[in-house]
């Protein structure tokens, strides 16, 4: 199964499509989302300042029919299938789960404790604390009353789940992002299985020019301090110190080389330097 998969799960009207759209799913005008959302898959391309990657957002819903009032028992039945041997490939391919709750729904609040109990089972089936993925509970509501959000947050965090109140904005007193920004940040900071670096072309060019200039010293007898090159301010100080140390060791090794061997070695070192910058 392809890498970079996230499951968005919840009962009807729990904000699954809203969460998917925030992550990056696009909904065309031809789509009919009035029925069950089970089986919807959105394949998107995400890009941040540092990387870009493909992502599959897989949406699922319980119960199977919208004519049935959802309850924690339906989630439990869903989890039995999810934890079955037939679903092992899916579980292994998941990078994360976003579980959505509609806090305006009285049944949702009534079923909160057994619902989170089922989520704990699902989490353990993925490997628990050893699982490299993320598991977030996302709450939506139309009410300005935050009491239900506080109740769900307490129940979630005490069991080790992150809770995101999708109606919040800005930052908390610890300068942590809230609401939509936190959901996006969760995806931006995850260690995805399959990514490509995404850097500004101008910055990348400056890095290569600086690396080429530094590595030219391996071919020269110039003892000028290599840390004086223009462009040093473009990189982290600690990273740059690692680069300088690597170049010093490379200079010593290059002294025993001549001609083509020395040129080839300088090229190899330059590529290594680029990985540091």
From Swiss-Prot:
Keywords tagged on the record: Chromosomal rearrangement
Entry superkingdom: Eukaryota
InterPro entries, per database record: Irc6 (IPR034627)
One GO process term, biological-process aspect: vesicle-mediated transport
Keyword Nucleotide-binding tagged: no
Pfam family, one: Adaptin_binding
Signal peptide, first to last residue: none
Molecular function GO terms recorded: protein-macromolecule adaptor activity
Protein purpose: Involved in gross chromosomal rearrangements (GCRs) and telomere healing.
Family statement: Belongs to the IRC6 family.
Name of this protein: Increased recombination centers protein 6
Provenance organism: Meyerozyma guilliermondii (strain ATCC 6260 / CBS 566 / DSM 6381 / JCM 1539 / NBRC 10279 / NRRL Y-324) (Yeast)
Gene: IRC6
